[in-house]
Every structure is written in C-alpha cells, then in structure tokens.
A protein has these predicted regions:
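Intrinsic, low-complexity terminal and presequence regions
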Residues: 392-411, 417, 421-472, 493
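Conserved phosphate/anionic-ligand binding catalytic regions in large, soluble enzymes, centered on
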Residues: 29, 34, 230-245, 414-431
Length: 550
C-alpha cells in the first residue's frame, strides 16, 4: 500500500511541476485549472470504470478510496510548495461543495482546509445553494437548446471550461465611460445597447471565421477532440460598474449605496435581456461574464483619464487610475466579509460566468477548522457560485514561507516576495501592473474575527419530479444525434431488453418542452399514479436498469 501511495504521489508531483514549467509564448506556464470531486458525482457513480481504455467490472462509486488517495497526494504536494516554500501557481484546483460534503475532521479535510488557510490555492464551487450541479462541468454537449432566450451558465470554474465548451471570445464593455458621457439614465441605456450590439456583431464575425477555418482543416487537434464550436459562448463582460455609478449624473454614489445597487441590478438584467435577443437573432450561445480585467481595468482607466480629465476612477487624481472589476464593491469598503457577501450575493448571481468572490485575508487563518467553518458558512448561506479564501503571504529565499505582508524577512532582513491573488491566481505583488498594484494598496482585507453573519440560511433547491401524465405508458428516452452518452443509454436499455420509445429531443421539441426535458439522455419511467420518474443521465439510467432486473 505504501508503494502505491508513493507512486501516486510521484505521478501527481510530476504533473504539478510539469504544468508550472514555462512552456507558453512569453516563457509563461500554461493556465491550468482542474476540478476535483470530494464525493463520487451521481452522473458517474453507476458507470463501470474505464482503465487504459477498457471497461472494468467495478464502478466509479467503488473507487472512493482511490479518490481519497489522489486528493491527499495532490494537496500534500501543494502544501509543501516548491524548494523555496512558494505555493504552486498552477493548477488552480476547484473543489465541489455539495449537500453531502463530509465536514468531519478527516485527514483529507484537514489537509484541504490547511492548504486553503495557508496558500488560498483552491476555488470552491457552491452546489448547495447555487443553481449549478457537479455534473455541469461534464455535460455541456448533453444540454438541450429549446428556448433560445434562456441564458445558460458557462461551466468549469473561473479560468477553466467544462467539456465541449468554452468561449469564442470576450468583449469587455467600459461602463464608467458610458456613464460619464450619458446625459441621463435613458441615454445611458441607449449607449450601452449600442456598445452591446457592436460587441455581439464582432463576436458573430469571429465565430464565422474560426468555424470556417475549423471546417477547412486548419485546427486539426481542435477538430479531433472538440469537433464543433456550437457549444462555445460568445462572451460579453463589463468593467467598472462601481465607477459607472459614481460618474452617473443621476446617482454620483458608489456601489456601497443601495440606490447604486438597484441601478446595477437593473443594468445587469438589461444586459441579460439583450443577450437573449442576440441568441434569437444569431442562433448562438451568449453569456454575461464578470470579466477578470487583469490589465483592462488599468488600461481603460488610463486612457479615459487622458481623454476625459474629469472622469472618476477608483483613485484620486494624481494616483494611478484603475477601475473596479465588474460590479465588485470598492476595494476599501469594509472589513466585514458578510456585509460584502450580502451585497455581492444579489449581483453575482445575475452573471452566467466568470463571477467569483474573493475573501481577501491579511494573513493565514489560525487553523484548518477556521478555514472550513468559513467555507461552510458561505456555501450554506449564500447563492454565489464560486468563491475563494485569499490570504496574503510572503516568501524569503532563505527562510521560506512568512505569514502576511512582510517586505523584509524578520529573521535575516532580506527583501522578500509578497504574494496575493490578482484576478484569480497568485503572483508576487512586485510583478503586478501599476493599476493592480494601486488596487492592492487600497484594498481592505476582511477580518474574520469581527465579521458577523447577517442573514438566515437559504432554502436549498431540490429536484422536482415531473408530474404531468402522458397517454403513453411506455418508457420514453429523450436523446440527441450527437451526444455520446445517448448512444450508451440506448445500448444499455437494448442489452437489458427493456422496451422504450426513442424520442429525438431536437426534432420533437413540443414533447420535449411538455416534459421539461433539460438534457440528454433523459429516461422517463411511468408510475402507477400517471406521473413519471425522471433519470437524467446515463449513470442514473444504468442504476434504474440494474434495480429493475433484481
């Protein structure tokens, strides 16, 4: 057993060091994001495991110990850091917080939350109160597009993308400039609509060009593993909503003010409606993103200040200008994390991708228990989909990891590197662009000891069984032509000699809408009371087959 552990750890260590090796243009390491499950997801639990391309006689739900072994090895290496004690920048791990997450003091839990407290490495996906499911990261090709006005969530975390999906391109709209130039609120919306129309057209043109290049064989690798850009989003984002509220002649208040929060909600809902219009007009997927704006927030503010000297940025005149990311609060607004969460929870849930709440901490949390408690509180009381705990730490070349922001080593007096999160990943503050460096100076970190939870536990959503009867008393299997899981579901049902009515979900849209089918494959099994039991992935379909044959 020790030999197996050592081999697993060696393999993962090789992977981690590999992805942190500069191999991109500009001698950069590739942006790498991985999603790790803490429990076996239900869309895979009942499927036979595949090892080396061959199906095994055991299921993924039987591999819990192997999951723990891989998770433990990964976290141990991330906690150890490199030879100088620096945390690894990549891969950025995303962990799923589900309703059945085990919060007990297990060895792996201690390691996970120690890593979070020390380096702030992981992202957490909130599957308790948000409208996401753990299977979303794998099921984009199975989603049905019945309502062209429906805006879908882009799965896969802050930097990553789920299987078979991604983004054609991103256009970020400069909100402060629109607000500064607008005479009144009506003029603001007219200017915003004009910019969004331009963004949508540009993304459509880009989609046409790269699709043509894909079809002509110029992207052979992409063609092999992806095949099509049909499930890719055309992304429109925004920057500087806080400064837009300050520049708006009818507001002149930042986002900590309730009037500005209401205006921001209205703006985001307006943008969502426009994206639905574009989906109908162009037939493509569009999404609203809280774009990271790592350099954009500084570049746009710098250009605006040159062109419009009286425009309000996040800093006073004479200081380096920058805009606050998307619809985030002013960086120096509060040290109470729950006050900030109460406001952001109402705004971030209106985006369909890119949104994340960073719990910026001045130093390492005192214990893994404190880290776990905070992660749990956020997941159980808020709806925002992604969040991080982001402690600041320093690195001395001689003495390694130092807690908090220390520009000189307290032991040897040498200059250190101060690390903090810049729009999603950790970098030495000394290497940030001028705008982000100014933001770091202005940033007020959250004091967990004095933060008070102000709201009650959200009602968690449950899956509701479809209760509409149909004349047919046979099983109905909703599939699509391109979904590989649909072929597997048909094969399993045929092999078990179970009769069913095959329904092409895309061709028979009326029936698909009638039964509110959201993804393929979905099996509807009639019950005695005339309603249907729903099995909406191949794993659950396989479980139904096995139980029906007992």
């Amino acid at each position: 057993e020790m030999c197996i552990r050592d081999r697993v750890k060696q393999c993962i260590q090789s992977f981690i060091y590999g992805v942190n090796t500069p191999s991109r243009w500009g001698t950069q390491a590739p942006f790498t994001n991985i999603t790790l499950d803490w429990t076996v997801p239900n869309d895979m639990a009942e499927l036979n495991a595949i090892v080396g391309g061959k199906e095994q006689n055991f299921k993924y739900k039987d591999c819990v110990e192997e999951m723990r072994l891989v998770n433990k090895a990964f976290i141990e290496i991330m906690i150890e850091g490199d030879a100088n004690g620096r945390g690894f920048q990549y891969p950025i791990p995303t962990y799923s917080i589900t309703k059945d997450f085990d919060w007990s003091p297990t060895e792996n839990n201690k390691l996970l939350f120690e890593m979070t407290a020390k380096y702030g490495t992981p992202y957490f996906s909130n599957y308790i109160n948000s409208d996401m499911e753990p299977s979303d990261v794998r099921s984009m090709c199975c989603r049905l597009r019945l309502d062209l006005r429906e805006l879908r969530k882009k799965s896969g975390g802050f930097f990553g993308s789920g299987e078979s999906t991604g983004s054609i391109g991103v256009v970020t709209i400069n909100m402060p400039r629109i607000a500064y130039l607008a005479k009144d609120e009506t003029d603001f919306y007219e200017r915003l609509e004009k910019m969004m129309n331009l963004a949508a057209r540009s993304l459509k043109i880009k989609r046409k060009v790269i699709t043509r290049l894909l079809d002509e064989g110029l992207y052979p690798y992409t063609k092999r593993y992806l095949g099509t850009f049909d499930n890719h989003f055309s992304t429109i984002g925004l920057v500087g909503m806080n400064e837009a509220c300050l520049n708006a002649k009818w507001l002149k208040k930042d986002l900590s003010n309730e009037e500005s929060q209401i205006f921001t909600k209205n703006v985001l809902n307006f943008m969502r409606e426009k994206l639905s219009d574009y989906q109908e007009q162009y037939g493509d997927l569009y999404n609203l993103e809280a774009t990271p704006a790592e350099s954009t927030s500084y570049r746009l503010a710098r250009h605006d200040r040159k062109q419009f000297p009286n425009i309000i940025t996040a800093t006073e005149k004479g200081n380096t200008p920058y805009y606050t990311n998307s619809s985030h609060l002013p960086v120096g607004f509060t040290s109470d994390v729950f006050t900030a969460l109460d406001i952001q929870d109402e705004l971030q849930t209106l985006y369909t991708s890119g949104t994340v709440f960073h719990v910026f901490l001045g130093q390492k949390l005192p214990s893994w228990e404190a880290s776990a408690k905070l992660v749990r509180k956020i997941a159980e009381n808020y709806r925002l989909p992604y969040y991080t705990l982001s402690p600041t730490y320093s690195i001395c070349q001689s003495h390694g990891y130092l807690d908090g922001e220390q520009y000189k080593c307290p032991i040897c007096g040498r200059k250190t590197e101060v690390y903090s999160r810049i729009t999603g990943y950790y970098r030495p503050v000394q290497n940030w662009n001028d705008g982000k460096a100014e933001e770091f100076k202005n940033r007020k970190t959250y004091d967990i000891a004095t933060s008070v939870l102000h709201k009650n536990h959200h009602e968690t959503s449950c899956n509701v069984k479809h209760d509409e009867a149909n004349d047919a008393k046979e099983l109905m299997l909703f599939t699509t032509k391109t979904c590989p899981n649909c072929k597997m579901a048909k094969m399993l049902l045929d092999k078990a000699n179970i009769k069913y009515i095959p329904i092409d979900a895309e061709e028979q849209k009326e029936l698909t809408k009638k039964f509110a089918i959201r993804k393929a494959p979905t099996l509807l099994v009639p019950k005695q009371d005339g309603t249907y039991e729903t099995y909406d992935n191949v794993s659950l379909i396989k479980k139904y087959i096995e139980e029906s044959q007992k």
